């Protein structure tokens, strides 16, 4: 089996995390997984949603979108259609769930964190790139809150979060699928993990024949290998 990109089966794409990419948001990152590029920002606002008022904890929510020409052909903006699509809603809920797992909300204070992930170029793995990049933007936003005199109850960041795709391509497990691989894969799996080694989410779909337990285990092992590298890239980015 030869991958279209020439990568080894267990090889990530070239990944770059550029911090402070925009000047207004408390945290901002340009994350690049090969040719997939996503701008991730985290904005801090005082107050929490009504369902959390008086409970002494903060909140995090996420939104996701793609520029019309992030793909090979122009897509109509969802705003001009008047509603978000099912895929968009699914992905932004995944991003929010994943990043909330990084935080102790009781230490966040009476604030809401708004995570915005905007895909400017898509070549597969946009949701996993969004989570991995937004995690770094979130860490930066927490530093800003602390500088402003917040986080009196301690650091709310419990652990780092990252995500990666794996799949069965031409009968073999591969790591970090690009668009060509994703569109032809027999199985596509998105995995979200913590830096402590726990799983937050495993989303898997067989596009053709069902995948077998041993194939699932092989894909998860590849994902764990990729996570080790992703967490190191996050740490290196935050150390700059």
Swiss-Prot record:
It holds the Pfam family RNase_PH_C. Its EC number is 2.7.7.56. Phosphate binds at residues 87, 125-127. It comes from the Bacteria. One of its GO terms (biological process) is rRNA processing. GO terms for molecular function: 3'-5'-RNA exonuclease activity; tRNA binding; tRNA nucleotidyltransferase activity. Keywords: Nucleotidyltransferase, RNA-binding, rRNA processing, Transferase, tRNA processing, tRNA-binding. It catalyses: tRNA(n+1) + phosphate = tRNA(n) + a ribonucleoside 5'-diphosphate. InterPro entries: ExoRNase_PH_dom1, ExoRNase_PH_dom2, ExoRNase_PH_dom2_sf, PNPase/RNase_PH_dom_sf, Ribosomal_Su5_D2-typ_SF, RNase_PH, RNase_PH_bac-type, RNase_PH_CS. Belongs to the RNase PH family. Homohexameric ring arranged as a trimer of dimers. Phosphorolytic 3'-5' exoribonuclease that plays an important role in tRNA 3'-end maturation. Removes nucleotide residues following the 3'-CCA terminus of tRNAs; can also add nucleotides to the ends of RNA molecules by using nucleoside diphosphates as substrates, but this may not be physiologically important. Probably plays a role in initiation of 16S rRNA degradation (leading to ribosome degradation) during starvation. HAMAP family: RNase_PH. NCBIfam families: RNasePH. This is Ribonuclease PH. The gene is rph.
């Amino acid at each position: 089996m030869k991958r279209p990109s020439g990568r080894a089966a267990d090889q990530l794409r070239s990944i770059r995390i550029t911090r402070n990419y925009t000047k207004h948001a408390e945290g901002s990152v340009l994350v690049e997984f090969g040719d997939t590029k996503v701008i991730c920002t985290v904005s801090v606002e005082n107050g929490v949603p009504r369902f959390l008022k008086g409970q002494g904890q903060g909140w995090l929510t996420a939104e996701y979108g793609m520029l019309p020409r992030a793909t090979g052909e122009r897509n109509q903006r969802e705003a001009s259609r008047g509603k978000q699509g099912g895929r968009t809603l699914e992905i932004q809920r995944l991003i929010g769930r994943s990043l909330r797992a990084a935080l102790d909300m009781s230490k966040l204070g009476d604030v809401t964190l708004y995570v915005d992930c905007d895909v400017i170029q898509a070549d597969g793995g946009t949701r996993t790139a969004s989570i991995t990049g937004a995690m770094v933007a979130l860490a930066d936003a927490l530093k800003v809150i602390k500088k402003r005199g917040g986080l009196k109850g301690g650091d709310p960041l419990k652990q780092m979060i990252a995500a990666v795709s794996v799949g069965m391509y031409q009968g073999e497990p591969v790591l970090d699928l690009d668009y060509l691989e994703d569109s032809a894969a027999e199985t596509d799996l998105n995995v979200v993990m913590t830096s402590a080694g726990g799983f937050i989410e495993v989303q898997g779909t067989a596009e053709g024949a069902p995948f077998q337990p041993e194939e699932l285990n092989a894909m998860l092992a590849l994902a764990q290998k990729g996570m080790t590298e992703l967490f190191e890239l996050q740490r290196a980015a935050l150390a700059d």
